[in-house]
């Protein structure tokens, strides 16, 4: 038996979750002390008010009431635009939730003809609860997961729009103060999301347990709906937010920077507010929902496999909750790690920012390895058995620790390889920048080659972690490796959210007409944020591959498939169709960004041509029209990709059966991961090649610049092509592979009973 008793588990998990939420609120309270509203005395000429505290001595001349007012106005415009978009999207997503909840109930309830009689359990002796009740609880957990995901995304966006202007104003004190404000704000989102995800899942398990009692097989099967709800909302957040942000970004860049030769975030550009809104709805709300979905799904996959292993059969609640205990330890580890950035060390110069963020990843991974070792010793029996395709495999507690540790360190390796290929501090991006000498075509060729090459090491890291974890603990080992990769999610999310907050802060500084030296500081924050955003995408894609495989294993077990035979025609046709789906999905999202950007370009050109004095800065552009174009386009364009992902498992499972569906899932996983990594890294490299030329921090960079040169224009074109790759198609693909797998798992009993209708008549 485990050292940690059931009572200890019941205390430890919610306490860690609550500590995470309290820490998030404390960070928010500290950020809120930075005031964006000028004091009453600040309007008086020469008045010495509190705002004098902001300014470093040589910039005392900037103690200007108007700067603070402008920052507040811009922040309000960005916040209102983001809120408006999310509420519009949530109306459509709400309708989808209701319809899909009804489908879950009808499909799963029909397995035993809506009977209320108990049935013999599949994997353990005894009677399990009726399928009708499992259908009801699966529907409830789907709605809970969906609502938690939506609330997490919304709160993340609210925090980011609350923090952006505060980061700008703190930049007047120095780069260190601005960094801490942006990072604390990111930490609010990271801890709020990871802690609330854990607490809601734990409460759901305990509430469902009141009904299910000893039927843990049915209990954890119904919990899988939580992962499906979280990930389906993430799909719409990522795709809708990605289309929104990139339509605005491409439109603003093409007309503003290439045609009109005005700087990024120039207030004369009509698309500039839409562009800044997009950073929040795509990179904050979408990314938060994405990682929440990964966490929920890997937990569900581990719980489903554990419920039919010795943990579930022997009703060992502490060992059963091992995935949740790992996440609980992760919250405490991330809390300690965050203090290193905010309290123990101070950033004094711009070149200290990126190392500080990288240290966060290394410290959290090292501490988490120790934490997992301790919890594996306390929570797991010395020996236990894990379900492995019809047989039980004996595993030790240290074996399972090794599975989690392999996933944890594989995530760090993927993160740093991603950084190597996307940071302009290293030769790959510098080579891409150098290729701009001969125009945009060579820039595109070099960027694509970099993206394809960047797939190699992450895939080997994923392959090694799959082989090691499967050899030790079968599919449960893979699920725990995925959870290991996601165990430092609070720190990962804090670093990820820091990027868009810094980006917005730079935009606000430019629009408020602040000193170029303030802009240099926000640019330094943004440059580090760009690299860490690429690292975050690497984590998301790597964890998605492991999560998808773990869900695939749970689906195959639940559907009663003994072996997936690639030589079987039923499986093979699924395999090649599944491998095609990421291309179809990417085509839809890329085209959506392109068509939305076309409308945006036309509108921006129209305003420059028809509004007198706009180019001279004497007239204001119509920001609202551009915001509306992005909102309408993203809502309309997110439906077809969403339908493709949600309907494919239902159609394939019902018409062709579980064997073909298992082929589709395997094919989508194999091709989707490769495209996602290459798309994200290609786009990230083009973006940083452009920034490398703009910054001109080395002799080589200065030989390619300055802004407005032919080299720079070629780099801007590459960056514009890369925008939808790195922020729409690439990140959305990891949701495609996870979502199809978790949906197949939820509907597995229905497909096993009624699936393969077409083959029955052929």
UniProtKB/Swiss-Prot annotation:
InterPro entries: PPase-energised_H-pump (IPR004131). The chain crosses the membrane at residues 7-33, 82-111, 132-159, 183-212, 216-244, 283-308, 317-342, 351-378, 398-421, 444-468, 475-501, 531-559, 570-598, 628-656, 658-685, 729-754. The keyword Metal-binding applies. It is found in: Vacuole membrane. It comes from the Eukaryota. Disulfide bonds join 121-128. It is an enzyme of class 7 (translocase). Keywords: Disulfide bond, Hydrogen ion transport, Ion transport, Magnesium, Membrane, Metal-binding, Translocase, Transmembrane, Transmembrane helix, Transport, Vacuole. One of its GO terms (cellular component) is vacuolar membrane. Its EC number is 7.1.3.1. It catalyses: diphosphate + H2O + H(+)(in) = 2 phosphate + 2 H(+)(out). It holds the Pfam family H_PPase. The keyword Ion transport applies. GO terms for molecular function: diphosphate hydrolysis-driven proton transmembrane transporter activity; inorganic diphosphate phosphatase activity; metal ion binding. The record marks 238, 283, 290, 297, 727, 738 as: Important for proton transport. Monomer. Belongs to the H(+)-translocating pyrophosphatase (TC 3.A.10) family. K(+)-stimulated subfamily. HAMAP family: PPase_energized_pump. Has 16 transmembrane helices and a cytoplasmic domain that contains the active site. Contributes to the transtonoplast (from cytosol to vacuole lumen) H(+)-electrochemical potential difference. It establishes a proton gradient of similar and often greater magnitude than the H(+)-ATPase on the same membrane. This is Pyrophosphate-energized vacuolar membrane proton pump. It comes from Hordeum vulgare.
């Amino acid at each position: 038996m485990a050292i940690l008793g059931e009572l200890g588990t019941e205390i430890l998990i919610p306490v860690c979750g609550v500590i995470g939420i309290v820490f998030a609120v404390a960070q928010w309270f500290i950020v809120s002390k930075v005031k964006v509203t000028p004091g009453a005395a600040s309007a008086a000429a020469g008045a010495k008010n509190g705002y004098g505290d902001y300014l470093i001595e040589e910039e005392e001349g900037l103690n200007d009431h108007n700067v603070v007012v402008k920052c507040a106005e811009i922040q309000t415009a960005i916040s209102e635009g983001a809120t408006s978009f999310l509420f519009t999207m949530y109306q459509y997503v709400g309708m989808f939730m209701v319809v899909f909840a009804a489908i879950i109930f009808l499909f799963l309830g029909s397995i035993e003809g809506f009977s209320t009689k108990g049935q013999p359990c599949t994997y353990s002796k005894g009677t399990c609860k009726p399928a009708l009740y499992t259908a009801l609880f699966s529907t409830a957990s789907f709605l809970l997961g969906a609502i938690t995901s939506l609330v997490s995304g919304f709160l993340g966006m609210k925090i980011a729009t609350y923090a952006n202007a505060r980061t700008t104003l703190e930049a007047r004190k120095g780069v260190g103060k601005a960094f801490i404000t942006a990072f604390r704000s990111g930490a609010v989102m990271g801890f709020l999301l990871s802690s609330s995800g854990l607490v809601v899942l734990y409460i759901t398990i305990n509430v469902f347990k009141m009904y299910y009692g000893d039927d843990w097989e049915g209990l954890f099967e119904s919990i899988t709906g939580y992962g499906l709800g979280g990930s389906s909302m993430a799909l719409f957040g990522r795709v809708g937010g990605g289309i929104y942000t990139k339509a605005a970004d491409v439109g603003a860049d093409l007309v503003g920077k290439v045609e009109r030769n005005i700087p990024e975030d120039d207030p004369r550009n009509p698309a500039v507010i839409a562009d800044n809104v997009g950073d929040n709805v795509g990179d904050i709300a979408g990314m938060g929902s994405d990682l929440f979905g990964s966490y929920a799904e890997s937990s569900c996959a581990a719980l489903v496999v554990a419920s039919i292993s010795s943990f579930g059969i022997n009703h060992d609640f502490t060992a059963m909750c091992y995935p949740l205990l790992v996440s609980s330890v992760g919250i405490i580890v991330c809390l300690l790690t965050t203090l290193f950035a905010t309290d123990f060390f101070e950033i004094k110069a711009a070149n200290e920012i990126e190392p500080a963020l990288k240290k966060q990843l290394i410290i959290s991974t090292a501490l988490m390895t120790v934490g997992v070792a301790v919890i594996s010793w306390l929570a797991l029996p010395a020996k236990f058995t894990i379900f492995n395709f019809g047989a039980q495999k004996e595993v030790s507690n240290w074996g399972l620790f090794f599975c989690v540790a392999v996933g944890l360190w594989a995530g760090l390796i993927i993160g740093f390889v991603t950084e190597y290929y996307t940071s302009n501090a290293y030769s790959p991006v510098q080579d891409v920048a150098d290729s701009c000498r001969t125009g945009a075509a060579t820039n595109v060729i070099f960027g694509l080659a970099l993206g394809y090459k960047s797939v190699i090491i992450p895939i080997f890291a994923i392959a090694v972690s799959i082989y090691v974890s499967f050899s030790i603990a079968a599919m449960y080992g893979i699920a725990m490796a995925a959870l290991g990769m996601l165990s430092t999610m609070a720190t990962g999310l804090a670093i990820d959210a820091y990027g868009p907050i810094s980006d917005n802060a730079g935009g606000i500084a430019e629009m408020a007409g602040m000193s170029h030296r303030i802009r240099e500081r926000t640019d330094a924050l943004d440059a580090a944020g760009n690299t860490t955003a690429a690292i975050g995408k690497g984590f998301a894609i790597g964890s998605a591959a492991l999560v998808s495989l773990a869900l695939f294993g749970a689906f195959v077990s639940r559907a009663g498939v003994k072996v997936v035979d690639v030589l079987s025609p039923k499986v093979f046709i699924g395999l090649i169709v599944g491998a095609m789906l990421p291309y179809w999905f990417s085509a839809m999202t890329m085209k959506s960004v392109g068509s939305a950007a076309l409308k945006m370009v036309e509108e921006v050109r129209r305003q420059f041509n028809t509004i007198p004095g706009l180019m001279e800065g004497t007239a204001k552009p119509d920001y609202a029209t551009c915001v509306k174009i992005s909102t309408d386009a993203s809502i309309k364009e997110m439906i077809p990709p969403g339908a493709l992902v949600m309907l494919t498992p239902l159609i394939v499972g019902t018409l062709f059966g579980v064997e073909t569906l298992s082929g589709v899932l395997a094919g989508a996983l194999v091709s989707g991961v490769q495209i996602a990594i290459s798309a994200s890294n290609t786009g990230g490299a083009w973006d940083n090649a452009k920034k490398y030329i703009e910054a001109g921090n080395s002799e080589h960079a200065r030989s390619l610049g300055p802004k407005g040169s032919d080299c720079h224009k070629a780099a801007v074109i590459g960056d514009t092509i890369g925008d939808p790759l790195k922020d729409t198609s690439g990140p959305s693909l990891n949701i495609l592979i996870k979502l199809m797998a978790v949906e197949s798992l939820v509907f597995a009993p229905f497909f096993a009973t009624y699936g393969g209708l077409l083959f029955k008549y052929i």
